[in-house]
Regions:
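Catalytic phosphate/nucleotide-handling subdomain of diverse soluble enzymes
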Residues: 345-347
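Hydrophobic alpha-helical transmembrane segments of membrane proteins
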Residues: 1-92, 101-340, 352-388
Length: 388
């Protein structure tokens, strides 16, 4: 269970293996360069917007930064927990015959965290907000260093939580325990909101200390903030190895139960399109992380809106939010990250437009079902709140 150099070397081998699977390496390099350039632009350009670095709006942005830091941590935790410990460098079934250690999986999940679109958008939001709040001064450099380190800290902590939750979920009564824990956390949040204590709790989050140290300019206070973030990140990376090994020694009960179910054979589809739709539909609804993600997307925004006293006229943003989240959750995976499915689909004698049409149909079904669940849950919660 040691943090060995072999695990680090294995991560390098697997990353190079993934990079060489790209059909067009030149395009892959251009995409990476565009992502880095976009990140740099987001981190600098808002500082030159009129009103940046001074005025009421910039001050309001800086005031909300501690909550934004905590929100990024929450998003990172939810994404990692829902995905069952993070994205794999190599799929579990393909990695079975190879001596890939859980430490390698842990480090690989950390490196692949930016592949998550929710992670990337939240990171850009933090960088852009910091640039607007601080303005075009040299303090922007020190502030962005603190923000970048916080991205590393939050991602490392999220992986520790995700591997721990996965180890608990794979225990004998882990699924029931996880559901009880989720219900307890939800009930606690509702109680805090009912007692008007949610905002005071958010105002006391420890990220306030980090934000103050980041905007203080180059000083001993800033150096201490950077040192604390580096120490927390290193400790989280090392600590995450232990729950990763614990989870690896236990069977994924919910995934294995779904994969081992016996299903009656259905009649052959009438066309290639129907066959592909059936295959894609099964791949979505028989994947446990996709089910978890659907519930989070369908129920989460409505509960957050109710807890935050979002006006009813502003509820119209929720369908678009849920639809875009569902498109990112399933659509990006279906078209860009579906490595295992992409390997064998390319060998089928099917026209590319048929594959595209099938995935579009299944994506539309996924979004419609998610939005229907969201609408029902939001209306039910609203009636309960109004009755209370």
């Amino acid at each position: 269970m040691d943090f060995s150099t072999r695990a680090v070397a294995d991560v390098g081998h697997l990353m190079r293996f993934r990079a060489r699977r790209a059909r067009n390496p030149a395009t892959h390099r251009w995409v990476m360069a565009a992502m880095l350039g976009g990140t740099l632009l987001v981190a600098v350009a808002p500082a030159f917007v009129p009103g940046a670095g001074g005025g009421d709006q910039a001050l309001s942005v800086l005031t909300l930064m501690p909550v934004a830091f905590a929100g990024f941590l929450a998003v990172a935790v939810v994404s990692a927990v829902v995905s069952g410990g993070g994205r794999e460098l190599l799929p579990r079934d393909q990695a079975a015959p190879y001596p890939i250690s859980p430490t390698t999986d842990h480090l690989g999940a950390l490196l692949l965290a930016p592949v998550n679109t929710a992670w990337l958008l939240q990171a850009w939001l933090l960088l852009g907000s910091t640039a607007y709040g601080v303005g075009a001064t040299w303090d922007l450099v020190t502030a962005q260093v603190v923000v970048l380190l916080w991205l590393l800290v939050a991602t490392s902590i999220a992986q520790v939580v995700a591997w721990t939750m996965e180890a608990i979920r794979r225990s004998r009564h882990g699924i029931v325990l996880m559901r009880c824990l989720s219900a307890t956390l939800l009930a606690t949040a509702v109680w805090l909101h009912a007692q008007h204590q949610l905002i005071p709790v958010l105002d006391r989050v420890p990220t306030v200390w980090l934000v103050v140290g980041g905007i203080d300019g180059f000083s001993w206070r800033w150096a201490l903030t950077v040192a604390v973030e580096v120490a927390i990140a290193l400790c989280a990376v090392l600590v995450g190895v232990f729950p990763a090994h614990l989870a690896a020694r236990r069977s994924a009960r919910d995934e294995l139960r779904v994969e081992s179910e016996t299903r009656e054979a259905r009649p052959n589809p009438r066309s290639d399109l129907f066959a592909l739709v059936r295959t894609d539909r099964s791949s979505v609804w028989r994947t446990v992380p996709m089910r978890r993600g659907l519930l989070v997307l369908a129920i989460g925004p409505g509960l957050v809106a109710i807890a935050g006293d979002l006006p009813w006229h502003a509820m119209t943003i929720l369908p678009g939010l849920v639809a875009s989240g569902g498109a990112l959750l399933f659509g990006v995976n279906a078209w860009c990250l579906d490595g295992r499915g992409g390997l064998w689909r390319e060998s089928l004698p099917v026209a590319p437009q048929t594959v595209f049409t099938a995935r579009t149909i299944v994506l539309a079904e996924f979004l419609l079902i998610t939005e229907a669940i969201r609408r029902n849950s939001a209306s039910t919660t609203a009636r309960a709140v109004n009755t209370a």
